[in-house]
Amino acid sequence: MKFKDLRDFVQQLEQRGELKRIQMPISPVLEMTEICDRTLRNKGPALLFENPTGFDIPVLGNLFGTPERVAFGMGAESVSELREIGKLLAFLKEPEPPKGLKDAWSKLPIFRKIIAMAPKVVKDAVCQEVVIEGEDVDLAMLPVQTCWPGDVGPLITWGLTVTKGPNKDRQNLGIYRQQVIGRNKVIMRWLSHRGGALDFREWCEKHPGKPFPVSVALGADPATILGAVTPVPDSLSEYAFAGLLRGNRTELVKCRGNDLQVPATAEIILEGVIHPGEMADEGPYGDHTGYYNEVDSFPVFTVERITHRIKPIYHSTYTGRPPDEPAILGVALNEVFVPILQKQFPEITDFYLPPEGCSYRMAIVTMKKSYPGHAKRVMLGVWSFLRQFMYTKFVIVTDDDINARDWNDVIWAITTRMDPKRDTVMIDNTPIDYLDFASPVSGLGSKMGLDATHKWPGETTREWGRVIVKDEAVTARVDAIWKELGID
């Protein structure tokens, strides 16, 4: 199933019984969070709050509240189908030379399809049906959520931020939270290693003192939103990837006040600039860790223009202790990561990011071990291969007889196959999530790897234990008579 825009996706969800319209007035201050949180924990539907208290614009929440809806938004009918998307990205990340003419012909359709999915620029777009400029710009028109009691104020959460560095041919898409601090000002919380921050830094170096153009798309189609959080290879733009997911080219339109191109079917567009040197203290806000983050200083984005569709929808979410939408996204995108990792490390049989680990802070890897030290090579590879795992604090590696998604199995492997001193790898002074207050220095901390595999000669001098395995014939015999025994 393909979706041309967010409204089409909402309509399809409603037809499948996956969307609930809430007509009762509900406040964006705390109340929507409470309702969305309860719904998500019960694996419930997406929610369209049609009458937010004090606003005319409806709020769409819990959109990606189940892994199945994430998969549906990426054009797949099941979560397992996301492995095929991962295989495509793995191929594009490191394409293998054709083994012959027949192999070259077989791969040609893939490259043709990618070339055909280059974004299409249009002159007229529904995201610019209404234009608000100058003194008329007022972010108070948007029903921006205040999610938690200790939050300092309203927070834009699903904004797709579009930037372009002076030395780059392609735009960058990133999702950064934005604290509303005035009629036309928000704080752009992008970390120093993220694409938007890097573009801004390069701009300041090349154009010192000049304002940096920025645009933010709210309510883009699901393929474009999810493309921005997927490990797309550098050779492929997020817009082209979204086109592959959607099955047709992503339509873009040039902004009214700058040269940036934004999704033409988005609900709301914020256009403006960041003035170099204009900073403000951001936070505190409740975050995906389950804690309020520290206050820190980030650039201020001045909104000069708001364009939107007629009767727009405001897409929002909250973050808190898992499960929340980022954790659910992590569960679904986990299936995309597996083939990408397996392309680099074929010995990996499964990879799992438990949602309890705040989406990415812990990874469990199962593998076919072939030599002493093999598990350590794999854990170091996980930390270094994809930038998405730069902040993963704990990597547990087990043999392939362990189910990575079953804590009973994983804990059994840790407690029976590990010597704490020999099999623990500690790495100090590594990049850590700035929201991780447990690290001694902001943004810099340690990582731990646990080798919970069977040990080979060279790793131990002792005879290694044999796993107890039941007799298959006896198991079959008891299966056959089990009902007659009347035990349960």
UniProtKB/Swiss-Prot annotation:
Pathway: Cofactor biosynthesis; ubiquinone biosynthesis. Its EC number is 4.1.1.98. It comes from the Bacteria. Prenylated FMN binds at residues 175-177, 189-191, 194-195. Its main location: membrane. Mn(2+) binds at residues 172, 238. One of its GO terms (biological process) is ubiquinone biosynthetic process. GO terms for molecular function: 3-octaprenyl-4-hydroxybenzoate carboxy-lyase activity; metal ion binding. Binds 1 prenylated FMN per subunit. The active site is at 287 (proton donor). It is found in: Cell membrane. Its cofactor is prenylated FMN; Mn(2+). It is an enzyme of class 4 (lyase). Belongs to the UbiD family. Homohexamer. Catalyzes the decarboxylation of 3-octaprenyl-4-hydroxy benzoate to 2-octaprenylphenol, an intermediate step in ubiquinone biosynthesis. This is 3-octaprenyl-4-hydroxybenzoate carboxy-lyase. The gene is ubiD.
